[in-house]
């Protein structure tokens, strides 16, 4: 996958796409990638796609709980935020000195090396 854990992504689709600031202007929501599921091509983004989960009582805990947690979203609904320009960008792969390297297509900046 072209998105890694710890990177900042912009949400392109879904109910969490926009967030309103103090002046009422809509802005695209961004978040940090917490976990990547490569087989299903889904990611968990911090503070995005919050779902309510009802946990039944267990033997250790006497009471059940209602927990809010992030649910996975498909990787096609997000775009990487370019670290240089702070805008959403596509990720490209090129070969540099015999290794595959990811780069941001808008700024042409190398992101990191891929093993």
Swiss-Prot record:
- Which biological processes are named by the entry's GO terms? translation
Protein name as annotated: Large ribosomal subunit protein uL24
What the protein does comes down to:
One of two assembly initiator proteins, it binds directly to the 5'-end of the 23S rRNA, where it nucleates assembly of the 50S subunit. One of the proteins that surrounds the polypeptide exit tunnel on the outside of the subunit.
What does the sequence similarity comment in the record state about its family? Belongs to the universal ribosomal protein uL24 family.
Which controlled-vocabulary keywords does the entry list?
A: Ribonucleoprotein, Ribosomal protein, RNA-binding, rRNA-binding
Q: Which Pfam families match?
A: ribosomal_L24
Listed GO MF terms: rRNA binding; structural constituent of ribosome
Among InterPro entries, the record links this protein to: Rib_uL2_dom2, Ribosomal_uL24, Ribosomal_uL24_KOW, Translation_prot_SH3-like_sf
- What GO cellular component entries does it have? ribonucleoprotein complex; ribosome
Taxonomic classification:
Bacteria, Bacillati, Mycoplasmatota, Mollicutes, Acholeplasmatales
Q: Which gene encodes it?
A: rplX
SUBUNIT field: Part of the 50S ribosomal subunit.
Which top-rank group of organisms is this from? Bacteria
